[in-house]
Amino acid sequence: MKNTLATILSVSTRLSRGLVASLVIAGALVMPAAAQEKPTLTVHTYSSFVGKYGPGKALKERFEETCGCTLAWLTSDDSGGILSRMKLDGESSRADVVLGLDANLAGEAEATGLLAPHGRTLPALDMPVAWSSKTFVPFDWGYLAFVYDETKLKTPPQSLRALVDDPSGPRIIVQDPRTSAPGLGFLLWMKEVSGDQAGPAWTKLRPRIVTFTKGWSEAYGLFLKGEADMVLSYTTSPAYHIAAEKKTQYKAAAFAEGNYLHVELAAAMRTAKQPELAARFIDFVLSERFQELMPEGNWMYPAKTPAAGLPASFSTLVRPSKALLIDFAKVRDGRRGWIDEWLAATAR
């Protein structure tokens, strides 16, 4: 009996020790897993921003270093795609933040009621226009411009009117304003300069428009293949050729009437699942570690110039004398009618 009891106690002790050990091991396995469960911030942006050559990867790493979270990207093809997805998803959107909305779509985006006020007094921004939006925070910007190869085009037009009025002027490639942010920008540029004569101006220019492309990359690729004398792009585009290819023959034309602005915006979603992280990301957008990646990461001017200044590739870029930008609400109310005007004037 004694031996039996001893045996039982021994077995019981071993079982207890085994149970404790099992619980300790199980705890050791569970605790790190729990520790690794971080909140996820979902940022909706356009695909090239997070693509192979965009700044997205570096920005994700930099934000995750300090946020104690995981940053996940939700992508659409372009700025217009971001707005369309916002409207489609509505209150059920997975996004906490939208990043990369074109300012020309800001009025329409704000009218959805899906965006939250940023609630900040923004620092001084290095932009050619004053900024007062209570919803949107700009993170980069650029002037739209026609880019050309100075070894092939010796006398580029010096104004938009000259480009439109010269029947023997350069052949150009532009983007479709229904599917492209720069294309929409050019539509507004024509409207701002030509007013109620925008339709006739399009009709004059149409014979020298090689094609309207869906997006910027298609247009620029055709230009580089020699399909046109000029392409609608940005004054910052030559910086890429300088920095990446050591080529200096690509130039951008500054027009006498001024050049239209392209401004990219960030905003927090009112329906954000992670509102505190969304607020931190909006702060991050204007930080040094975000802004310093814009010039040679997104090939645009930063909204707030980093302490180190702009890279050398930006030092010779043309600076237009005037920046054009139509009020958000006016664009929201007029865009569809102006596109109809463009369609009627350019249809073949």
Please report, for each region that a protein language model flagged, where it lies by residue.
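Extracytoplasmic ligand-binding site segments that recognize negatively charged/polar headgroups
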Residues: K38-T40, H44-G56, D78-G81, S93-A228
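Mature extracytoplasmic/periplasmic domains
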Residues: M269-A323
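A bilobed periplasmic-binding-protein/Venus flytrap-type ligand-binding module shared by bacterial periplasmic
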Residues: A145-K152, K191, H262-Q274, L293
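Short beta-strand->loop
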Residues: L115-L122, K134-P138, R161-V164, M230, ...
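Periplasmic-binding protein-like
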Residues: P128, G142, W202-R206, F212-T213, ...
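A ligand-binding cleft/hinge motif common to bilobed small-molecule-binding domains
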Residues: N104-E108, L224, A228-Q249, N298
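An extracytoplasmic/periplasmic, membrane-proximal ligand-sensing/linker region
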Residues: A198-G199, P302-R348
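Short alpha-helix C-terminal cap/hinge motif
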Residues: K57-W73
